[in-house]
């Protein structure tokens, strides 16, 4: 089972930066009956390959006018979150200040590193810390400090967040309890898991960020 959606997203977060909008367009993909979160990454890779091919074939004139050189999505490397932090800290002599998230500068340096070392325009950063991800993100059974999730960086900017979700009802309740959250108001959501839910996952692509990086703009509002 697969669900695809293009729709507006409204976010109550700080947006006085070059990369944030409080209203943006999201391309959402959700997949059921998966064996691994890597299937979701493979699906996004295929989507990007299709999208770049379509742009090249149908919009060559517009790309020439805008002086856009399409990125290479034929192969997208992946690196664990903790490994990525260590790589850029060592390579660029940078101190790790936040062990639970990537700072914008770190994202840019990861993109730079993989461009220099592998000539890659995109890179998946996987296994984000559980503290950073929503309660429904599935923890890595081999190390529950991390999750079976990922971000996709395009030229050093996060354009996608995705991963595998918890599908077991009791595991979901435990995660909610461990987070100190209340289930009040979530009954309808939780009931769908009580009666059975297949292993599933998905992702969201920020369309404005993707477009910004394709055009080489410095500000998402442009």
What does each model-identified segment do?
Residues 1, 11-15, 48-56, 89-92, ...:
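Hydrophobic/aromatic-lined pockets within catalytic cores
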Residues 1-34, 191:
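Class II aminoacyl-tRNA synthetase-like tRNA-binding/catalytic domains
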Residues 3, 24-26, 119-122, 147-149, ...:
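Active-site lining segments that contact anionic ligands and/or coordinate catalytic metals
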Residues 28-39, 156-158:
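A generic structural motif
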Residues 29, 84, 125, 162, ...:
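A residue-level signal for conserved active-site and pocket-lining positions in enzyme catalytic cores
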Residues 41-48, 169, 208:
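Hydrophobic face of alpha-helices
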Residues 43-155, 178-191, 195-196:
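Metal-assisted phosphate- and nucleotidyl-transfer catalytic regions
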Residues 163-164, 169-222:
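Active-site pocket scaffolds in enzymes
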